[in-house]
């Protein structure tokens, strides 16, 4: 599923190099824990995404433990773009995901990009994945 078929004008993949330091990383594997800690600050983002992605569980206290990782990443991207007004978001850690999980994440990010036109860069060490989405 190449980028151009999904029509992601603001979403791209980039090769992740060692020692990249950015203040606006969205860490993939620790996001569930991060959301549980920061839940009160992200309630608006969670409510928006519950509606936008039609998440069945609407109890905000349990959503961070029940939602899939792709939705949790989308919540964090939304929170940083809309609430913290960052110009660019970097997502890392997708090398541990299956192709299906990555496609689901891209679809969720596409929904966000319809509402906001900021750069979202997905970092990867996987050259095959990188070439596939160019």
Regions found by a protein language model. Name each.
Residues 84-88, 96-130:
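Conserved catalytic loops of ABC-family nucleotide-binding domains
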Residues 49-69, 84-85:
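Conserved ABC nucleotide-binding domain
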Residues 69-92:
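GG-anchored amphipathic helix commonly corresponding to the ABC/SMC/Rad50 NBD signature/C-loop
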Residues 14-16, 61, 66, 89-93, ...:
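Conserved beta-strand segments of the P-loop GTPase G domain that flank and frequently precede/overlap
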Residues 132-134:
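A short helix-turn-beta junction within AAA+ P-loop NTPase domains corresponding to the substrate/partner-engaging
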Residues 19-24, 53, 70-73, 80:
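Glycine-rich phosphate-binding loops of nucleotide-dependent enzymes
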Residues 1-47:
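ABC ATPase nucleotide-binding domain signature region
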């Amino acid at each position: 599923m190449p980028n151009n078929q999904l029509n992601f004008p603001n979403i791209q993949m980039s090769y992740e190099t060692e020692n990249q330091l950015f203040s606006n990383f969205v860490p993939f594997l620790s996001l569930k824990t991060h959301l549980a800690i920061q839940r009160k600050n992200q309630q608006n983002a969670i409510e928006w995404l519950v509606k936008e992605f039609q998440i069945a569980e609407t109890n905000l206290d349990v959503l961070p433990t029940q939602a899939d990782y792709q939705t949790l990443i989308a919540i964090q991207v939304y929170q940083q773009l809309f609430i913290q007004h960052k110009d660019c978001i970097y997502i890392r850690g997708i090398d541990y995901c299956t192709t299906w999980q990555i496609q689901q994440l891209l679809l969720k990010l596409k929904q966000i990009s319809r509402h906001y036109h900021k750069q979202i860069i997905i970092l990867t060490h996987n050259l095959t994945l990188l070439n596939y989405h160019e």
